Amino acid sequence: MGESASTETLEKKQPFTAEEEAADGKKSHRSVVAVQPKPRKGILSSTIDLIEKVIVYFAHDSSKPLHYLTGNFAPVRDETPPFAALTVHGSLPVCLNGEFVRVGPNPKFSPVAGYHWFDGDGMIHGLRIKDGKATYVSRYVKTSKLMQEEYFEGAKFMKIGDLKGLFGLFMVQMELLRAKLKILDVSYGRSTANTAMIYHHGKLLALSEGDKPYVIKVLEDGDLQTLGLLDYNKRLAHSFTAHPKVDPFTDEMFTFGYSHTSPYITYRVITKDGVMLNPVPITIPEPIMMHDFAITENYAIFLDLPLYFRPKETIKGKLIFTFDPTKKAKFGVLPRYAKDEQLIRWFDLPNCFIFHNANAWEDGDEVVLITCRLKNIDLDLVNGAVKEKLENFSNQLYEMRFNMKTGAATQKELSAPMVDFPRINENYTGRKQRYVYCTSFANIDKVNGIVKFDLHAEPETGKKVLEVGGNVLGIFDLGPGRFGSEAVFVPREAGTRVEEDDGYLIFFVYDETTGESKVYVIDAKTMSPEPVAVVDLPCRVPYGFHAFFVNEEQIQKQQAEI
């Protein structure tokens, strides 16, 4: 905070040199690592399995229902190869030529004991669109974890759903023992790659925040092939967020990883040529869960929120991450090309947690963050046993402002509960924009609509439910018994010279009455209740997490570069 303004300007405006960017450039093609784990079967493996079964039988409460293995959360065990000539009601716009993908948890094998929604193996559901025709495909991300469990024909890695009480400590020891005895090969990590996807430098990445990215290739017929693990020529030695940011103006990618050992946060910049630059450790007092962050043209914004990694709490029957309602929410704003953390500015706001940010930008002396703010968080709500209610889970759209000159921080409520999974026209990432599209929720985990917000309009404060009016321009209601997932905005044209909301929203929908899954395409400008197109799918698509649209140009560029 004591640095001069001229120093701060130099740090935030100066990009890395050409020499730094090119340091590993000639090796960039080798940054995809073929995943070839070497687990071992034998007497030791069988003995540990037997011990585990006995302990689970006596120590695990199997009477508790595993909610996220039932209904449309239940996995589909089989992959679906490209299924072409799908029925399309309406017409698919030309700008949707490409592949719409959504990843989510889909456990291939039944859990040994507990199960949390975050635990399942990553399965990608894709809709290849070309010239008005659609093809559906689903494929597992071929992670090291999945390969090894296929080898054993059963679950072997511990799960978040197990990590409660003394039983949780036992399950941790079981995995450590299996790794020590080389029964499990953890040299390629433990990733499920089940959370989100992003495209950068000719590569489509499947992400989960506990490990490194997996590279997915989109084939011409829409099929999805796992190429391997991305370690940026061994420069990535820590976890990698599920929500990195790509600046559409510079083609750079910005990311971070969090850890339960110091440094708890590590910030990274990846050049437009796919070179990962030196790590920037971020100092915070305790290890936390930090699911998302944000960038502006000149800054990166870090969220030190009080969801702490506290293993001792598991003895009390809590999960390994515990929310502390007595602590302030802290936001760190760092010049995004900083070589270290010396120029970071920290701002305090009232206690909260944030899973997902919409966008951020600079407005005079202020840095503005648009986010979905949660007053409290209990990860047990997405554990095995869950009440399908919204009580104690009040996610709302907020505007937060951090004044880089005065050090003041303010926040403003922009919506009634409950909204999340905010998406924008990503041509505006890191720049001032107007429209945000969020999912609305019928209960803790089921999406019942898509809401369009106008950040230029004043919100109607005091409302308990979401209604059109004020800053709510439109709500697309899925109707009774139908539930969706994150909607991705696809612009009619690239760039920022056309109207920001001129485009379409595309998302998966499941009808719990008929058991049918579909893909909806709606007009993002008008939010008309009549979809532009509906595509009938050949099989059930379980509820999942984040989605992405790979356009035709990216598919062709990807095929040329990988």
UniProtKB/Swiss-Prot annotation:
UniProt keyword terms in alphabetical order: Cytoplasm, Dioxygenase, Iron, Metal-binding, Oxidoreductase
Entry EC no(s): 1.14.99.n4
Coiled coil ranges: none
Signal sequence, renumbered to the chain: none
GO CC annotation terms, alphabetical: chloroplast stroma
Compartments reported by the entry: Cytoplasm
GO terms of biological process kind: carotene catabolic process
Pfam families with a match to the protein in the record: RPE65
Tissue: Expressed in leaves. Detected in roots and flower buds.
Keyword DNA damage: no
Residues that, per the record, bind Fe cation: 243, 291, 356, 546
Keyword Ion transport appears in the UniProt entry: no
Highest taxon of source: Eukaryota
Region (Disordered): 1-32
Enzyme class: oxidoreductase
Catalytic activity entry: all-trans-zeaxanthin + 2 O2 = 4,9-dimethyldodeca-2,4,6,8,10-pentaenedial + 2 (3R)-hydroxy-beta-ionone
InterPro entries for this protein: Carotenoid_Oase (IPR004294)
Role description: Cleaves a variety of carotenoids symmetrically at both the 9-10 and 9'-10' double bonds. Catalyzes the formation of 4,9-dimethyldodeca-2,4,6,8,10-pentaene-1,12-dialdehyde and probably hydroxydihydro-beta-ionone from zeaxanthin.
Protein family per UniProt: Belongs to the carotenoid oxygenase family.
Further information: The carotenoid cleavage dioxygenase 1 (CCD1), which catabolizes carotenoid metabolites, is up-regulated in the floral tissues of the White Jade cultivar, resulting in a pure white flower.
Protein name from the UniProt record: Carotenoid 9,10(9',10')-cleavage dioxygenase 1
